Amino acid sequence: MVAESKAANPMREIVVKKLCINICVGESGDRLTRASKVLEQLCEQTPVLSRARLTVRTFGIRRNEKIAVHCTVRGKKAEELLEKGLKVKEFELKSYNFADTGSFGFGIDEHIDLGIKYDPSTGIYGMDFYVVLGRRGERVAHRKRKCSRVGHSHHVTKEEAMKWFEKVHDGIIFQAKKKKKMIRRRRR
């Protein structure tokens, strides 16, 4: 009886808080501006440039060099883009795509699979989708005035996120194979 009343509560309903789309080019310059145009065409808002945190000499990346573009989408537009992205993945994800916080992410190889026309001058870019799930009422933890805590039972868990994905998007979740532990032997 208590479980039924909890399920019927509209505040317990899981919603998409935001969708973050990232295209990492790995270098600044012309390829990055073309990736920015692709993301702007997809999201219909201006993307933000991301900078490298560290210098990696093997990849030829310097610290604070612009290497990626990302965009955060909310509301109905986020749900539409998520639907397009999941269509490309055929509504199939692996269990390790889901985080313990109830969020999940996946990547696609070609942006033209989302319905954008191919332009030879632009090229083809892959992108990462990261979906943050939450419940209504979580704003109380982030507001400026009368800030308070969100209870542990109100947080979205990994299992709840997986059930939500299977129910709302009729998705299929594959169980990830357990990795074998490698036994390293010392040479003597």
Curated annotation (Swiss-Prot):
The primary site where this protein sits is: nucleus
Q: Which Pfam families match?
A: Ribosomal_L5, Ribosomal_L5_C
**Gene Ontology, cellular component aspect:** cytosolic large ribosomal subunit; nucleus
Keywords of the record, alphabetical order, are: Cytoplasm, Nucleus, Ribonucleoprotein, Ribosomal protein, RNA-binding, rRNA-binding
Domain of life of the native organism: Eukaryota
Which compartments does it reside in? Nucleus; Cytoplasm
One biological-process term from Gene Ontology? translation
| MF-aspect GO terms | RNA binding; rRNA binding; structural constituent of ribosome
InterPro entries in the record: Ribosomal_uL5, Ribosomal_uL5_C, Ribosomal_uL5_CS, Ribosomal_uL5_dom_sf, Ribosomal_uL5_N
Its annotated function is as follows: Component of the ribosome, a large ribonucleoprotein complex responsible for the synthesis of proteins in the cell. The small ribosomal subunit (SSU) binds messenger RNAs (mRNAs) and translates the encoded message by selecting cognate aminoacyl-transfer RNA (tRNA) molecules. The large subunit (LSU) contains the ribosomal catalytic site termed the peptidyl transferase center (PTC), which catalyzes the formation of peptide bonds, thereby polymerizing the amino acids delivered by tRNAs into a polypeptide chain.
Q: Which family does it belong to?
A: Belongs to the universal ribosomal protein uL5 family.
* Assembly and interaction partners: Component of the large ribosomal subunit.
> What protein is this chain from?
Large ribosomal subunit protein uL5
Lineage of the organism: Eukaryota, Discoba, Euglenozoa, Kinetoplastea, Metakinetoplastina
